[in-house]
UniProtKB/Swiss-Prot annotation:
Keywords: Antibiotic, Antimicrobial, Glycoprotein, Immunity, Innate immunity, Secreted, Signal. GO terms for cellular component: extracellular space. GO terms for biological process: cellular response to heat; defense response to bacterium; innate immune response; response to bacterium; response to cold; response to heat; response to mechanical stimulus; response to oxidative stress. Belongs to the Turandot family. This is Protein Turandot A1/2. It is found in: Secreted. The gene is TotA1. It comes from Drosophila sechellia. The keyword Signal applies. Residues 1-21 form the signal peptide. A humoral factor that plays a role in stress tolerance; gives increased resistance to the lethal effects of bacterial challenge and stress. Regulated by the JAK/STAT pathway and NF-KB-like Relish pathway in the fat body, upd3 in the hemocytes and Mekk1 in response to septic injury and consequent immune response.
């Protein structure tokens, strides 16, 4: 009985990575989506509105990246976001962009556009190089 249970657990460990994760197809789809986002974001408002989608793609890609790549992009993102902490614990979602909002001043809009362009460039490099 013990050996059959152990064998079953071992089989599940071998099979589970095949069912979960970030497949090559997912990576290719995200690569195309990054290129599409960058190409279609012509004006400042569309760039600002597309920033969250870039961050979502980065979060999906995160487990497959090298430690150096993760630290590089995390440092960049953390410099441009504030942690929202209640009683020392981040709220669900954890971070809020400093530079993105419904009404953005011209100076903040420039920062938001710069953030979008730099983040898009960093993520696109992960797919091309």
């Amino acid at each position: 009985m013990n050996s059959s249970t152990a064998l079953m657990c071992f089989a599940l460990l071998l099979i589970s990575p095949l069912c979960l994760g970030y497949s090559d197809e997912d990576r290719e789809a995200d690569s195309r989506r990054i290129a599409e986002i960058i190409q279609n974001a012509q004006d400042d408002d569309s760039k600002i509105n597309s920033t969250q989608e870039l961050l979502d793609i980065y979060r999906r890609l995160y487990p497959t990246l090298s430690l150096e790549d993760r630290e590089n992009i995390d440092k960049f993102v953390n410099e441009h976001t504030d942690a929202i902490v209640i009683d020392g614990v981040p709220i669900q979602g954890g971070r809020k962009a400093k530079i993105i909002g419904k009404i953005v001043s011209p100076a903040a809009k420039g920062l938001a556009v710069g953030f979008f362009e730099e983040l898009g460039s960093k993520i696109a490099q992960l797919f091309t190089g």
